[in-house]
Amino acid sequence: MDYDVVVVGAGNAAMCSALAAEEVGAKVLVLEAATEELGGGNTRYTAGAIRTVYNGVDDLRELMPDLTDAECDITDFGTYTEDQFFDDMFRVTEYRTDPELVEILVKNSFNTLKWMREKGIRFAPIWGRQAFKVDGRFVFWGGLTVEAYGGGPGLCEALWESAKKRGIEILFEARALDLITDGNQVTGVKVRHKGKMEEIGAKSVVLASGG
């Protein structure tokens, strides 16, 4: 069977690519080499934390509408500006990151999480690791405030559920082995699915399996 888009990988980047393609009408297939119990790549083994620009609690409540007034009253979420995000990226990478890609990441971070929320991904404050108590109030530090419910495994499962609801097919135990090409054009993927070799045609292939 042929698809408009085949995505190799089923972690956060891969599934967001698949959801974005489906949003504009593409017929999408996702290939995950692991089983469903172990799938999701690095995403499964992370805490599900996602760094984003925000200008205060009102922004955070757009991402986390479950936040109560009582929780907000005893919490200082602070802010995390674009300049702080840029500084952190350049500090961590020792200025070896691509400036154009960093600008895309930083300037789109908040709207990307809003979009993920619209796709059904739920977020919560990282109370346990990123906040400490001062005079009875929780104070967040380090600019890392938001995590997906259920951590990495929860993020994987929420993304897969969102994709399935939208008709995106996910094949587990499907390892992409090679690209099919016609001249300089990629036309599909060679896959080993549960021990059987298959060739899957695609107008576009997204490689998102190397996190």
What are these regions (language model features)?
Residues 10, 54, 209-210:
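Glycine-rich, N-terminal phosphate-binding loop of Rossmann-like dinucleotide-binding domains
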Residues 23-43:
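Glycine-rich FAD pyrophosphate-binding loop
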Residues 34, 202-204, 208-211:
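Glycine-/small-residue-rich beta->alpha transition segments that form the dinucleotide
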Residues 44-80:
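N-terminal glycine-rich dinucleotide-binding loop that anchors FAD/FMN and/or NAD(P) in oxidoreductases
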Residues 1-3, 193-204:
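Core beta-strand elements of the Rossmann-like FAD/NAD(P) dinucleotide-binding domain
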Residues 18, 22:
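Gly/Ala-rich phosphate-binding loop of Rossmann-like dinucleotide-binding domains
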